[in-house]
Curated annotation (Swiss-Prot):
This is 4-hydroxy-tetrahydrodipicolinate synthase. The record marks T47, Y110 as: Part of a proton relay during catalysis. Homotetramer; dimer of dimers. Signal peptide: none annotated. It catalyses: L-aspartate 4-semialdehyde + pyruvate = (2S,4S)-4-hydroxy-2,3,4,5-tetrahydrodipicolinate + H2O + H(+). Gene3D superfamilies: Aldolase class I. It is found in: Cytoplasm. SUPFAM superfamilies: Aldolase (SSF51569).
Length: 297
């Protein structure tokens, strides 16, 4: 474990739909564009990919397409999380069989497990399938918080766990994960607003929503921070700030898919209970995309 490096700018891919079905041709085109733009890795079937409303067959189609299209040019991470440990194991098995380089496991949502329950959940998954695991902590969606002390315990006892996507937006907690865990443990932010400060603290990159829209800018931001060119990095951070804010003006991935439709990268379609962006927020998003030159005025 640990040979694969999950670092830099990694895009949490959207899932394009067309008349209720997955648009695989569009998905492959998006993946190819991401790689052409220099992205460092891809997450398929994560939160941004509307994983909650995918069937097993659709999950297989998407992971298979992502692995095939990347052709090992960048690492592929498969979202495999569930609040049902047995289902999480099943998804992990599928991802491994289809050739994913790693799996992303969100903390179980709704059940509200204790820290011991979280530890046992990840330990059980790792005991069944040997594949690099990234933990995923996003309390705003799950209703539970994976504490830094628990992360450190997991890393010590479960060698399959090679990193974490921390989407708390809490820099103190992010810092403690780095402090408590061994050197080489890969700590990525899942919050586009905190790419700059989190990497200065020692994080190794981001699993990003905004890189669906501006992959090259996010790649450059991460690269500049790694090279300690902080003044240039700050400029990109502030250039991206208005767009970052709009990505969460309504539930992810509603704004990002809307932006991609305005860029003519996909047809705008969601699965319920997600619905289209409100008219007022659509106008704000369209205006911002025009102002920063992503779409023509």
């Amino acid at each position: 474990m640990g040979q694969i490096q999950f670092q830099g700018a990694i895009t949490a891919l959207v899932t394009p739909f067309k008349k209720g079905e997955i648009d695989l041709e569009c998905y492959r085109e998006i993946i190819e564009w991401q790689i052409e733009q220099g992205i460092n890795g891809l997450v398929s079937c994560g939160t941004t990919g509307e994983s909650a409303t995918l069937t097993y067959e659709e999950y297989k189609l998407l992971i298979k397409a992502c692995v095939e299209q990347t052709k090992s040019r960048v690492p592929v991470i498969a979202g495999a999380g569930s609040n049902d440990t047995a289902k999480a194991i099943q998804l992990t098995k599928i991802a491994k069989e289809l050739g994913a380089d790693g799996v992303l496991h969100v903390t179980p949502y709704y059940n509200k497990p204790t820290q011991e329950g979280l530890f046992q959940h990840f330990k059980t998954i790792a005991s069944q399938e040997s594949i690099p695991i990234l933990l995923y902590n996003v309390p705003g969606r799950t209703g539970c918080n994976l504490l830094p002390e628990t992360v450190a315990r997991i890393v010590q006892d479960i060698p399959e766990v090679v990193g974490i996507k921390d989407a708390t937006g809490n820099l103190e907690q992010f810092s403690e994960i780095i402090e408590f865990c061994p050197i080489g443990f890969q700590v990525l932010t899942g919050d586009d607003f905190t790419i700059l400060p989190s990497m200065i603290l020692g994080g190794c990159g981001v699993i990003s929503v905004i890189s669906n829209i501006v992959p090259a800018m996010v790649v450059e931001l991460c690269s500049l921070i790694e090279k300690n060119k902080l003044e240039e990095a700050r400029q990109i951070h502030y250039n991206l700030a208005p767009l970052c804010r709009l990505m969460f003006v309504e539930t992810n991935p509603i704004p990002v898919k809307t932006a991609l439709s305005l860029m003519e990268k996909l047809e705008l379609e969601f699965r319920l209970p997600l619905t289209e962006l409100s008219p007022i927020n659509f106008t704000k998003l369209e205006s911002t995309l025009k102002n920063i030159g992503i779409i023509s005025k």
